[in-house]
Design a protein with these regions (language model features):
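Non-transmembrane, aqueous-exposed alpha-helical and coiled segments at domain scale
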Residues: 1-151
């Protein structure tokens, strides 16, 4: 399955003008990002917490450097948020369709909300804004022993 996604990513890079031949795709693995989306269902994230369908508008999984990402990359998140803001896109439809200025999506590590607005001018979509916030995760917990005469 990952090989098929890589083929899709390579052809996307070619169509977008990021590469000149499919052979170059292997040397440019960081873009474009490939993600897949689905309507929300109850699921457990990597911490064990259960996310209910009402907690999110859609589910999203993204690939980075040929592998499924353990969470959600910021670049993929803003792209998904923008696609959700454009009526009729696959992302917009997976999120329930219609006009929207934000989308909440579930990913393997939790949930993320992204705001976006875009408008169509002469049949060309222009992104006006995209916003998101992220929560920090604990990187370390411990104690530091400082001698009392240090102060």
């Amino acid at each position: 399955a990952l090989a098929r996604f890589e083929t899709i990513r390579a052809h996307g890079a070619l169509k977008m003008g990021l590469i000149e031949s499919l052979d170059e795709a292997a040397t440019r693995q960081h873009t474009p990002k490939v993600a897949f989306v689905a309507p929300p269902v109850a699921h457990r994230v990597s911490s064990g917490r259960e996310v209910m369908p009402d907690d999110v508008d859609l589910l999203a999984r993204a690939l980075s450097m040929g592998l499924l990402h353990h969470a959600m990359m910021g670049t993929a998140a803003v792209a998904l948020g923008t696609a959700a803001a454009i009526p009729g896109t696959l992302v917009n439809e997976a999120a329930g369709g219609g006009a929207r200025d934000s989308v909440r999506f579930g990913h393997p590590s939790g949930t993320l909300e992204v705001g976006a607005s875009a408008r169509s001018q002469n049949g060309v979509w222009q992104v006006e804004r995209v916003s998101m916030s992220r929560s920090a995760r604990r990187l370390m917990q411990g104690e530091v022993l400082v001698p009392g005469d240090s102060f």
